[in-house]
Design a protein with these regions (language model features):
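Short loop/turn motifs that connect adjacent beta-strands in outer-membrane beta-barrel proteins
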Residues: 16-24, 60-61, 117-118, 151-159
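A C-terminal functional module that forms or caps the active site or interfaces directly
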Residues: 120-157
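Intrinsic-disorder/low-complexity loop/linker signature
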Residues: 20-21, 41, 136
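Extracellular/periplasmic loop regions
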Residues: 25-116, 120-123
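Transmembrane beta-barrel architecture of outer membranes
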Residues: 4-12, 23-25, 46-52, 105-109, ...
């Protein structure tokens, strides 16, 4: 049981569809979150939303995917919180967004992945921006990720 004053409710949907030459995967998530900070007369309530939508196509062993995620903001004062998340897996690998900025976070990601020489490769590009640019913050940068995973003498090797 956590005592973090967060109430989060959401829905998620994923699907797959196969064509003659292309396999499709798609999905979406939506959540709403309320947070209460402080107590008594000094208590402040914040509300933020979360949205994620993706579409992926696999053809000839290569998967191309576009993913759009919004960790919303409450007027630049509070960003949608994910205190129980697997943090390094999402929003890029440089760990710049382990905590959602108060302005929120929009992550537009394009990725390609496939197999090569007995291993798996992944190339991903992230474009980050603020959900609420009311504090003069809008462009939060971009990131390029490249990964190759293979087995060497029964041990996994990731570069």
């Amino acid at each position: 049981d956590t005592d973090n004053a967060l109430d989060t409710y959401g829905v998620s949907y994923d699907g797959k569809m196969k064509g003659d030459n292309v396999s499709w995967a798609y999905g979406g998530e939506f959540a709403t979150q309320s947070s209460e900070v402080g107590a008594g007369e000094t208590a402040t309530d914040f509300d933020a939303s979360y949205l994620n939508a993706y579409l992926a196509a696999t053809f000839s062993g290569i998967t191309a995917k576009v993913d759009y995620e919004i960790l919303g903001s409450d007027d630049g004062m509070y960003g949608f919180a994910t205190p129980l998340a697997t943090l390094h897996k999402f929003n890029g690998w440089t760990d710049q967004f382990l905590g959602t900025p108060a302005q929120g976070l929009k992550d537009l990601k394009f990725s390609l992945s496939g197999g090569l020489a007995g291993g798996k490769w992944l190339l991903a590009y992230h474009d980050f921006s603020a959900d609420d640019s009311s504090n003069g913050v809008d462009d939060l940068g971009s990131e390029l990720n490249l990964q190759y995973v293979t087995t060497v003498q029964n041990e996994h090797l990731t570069t």
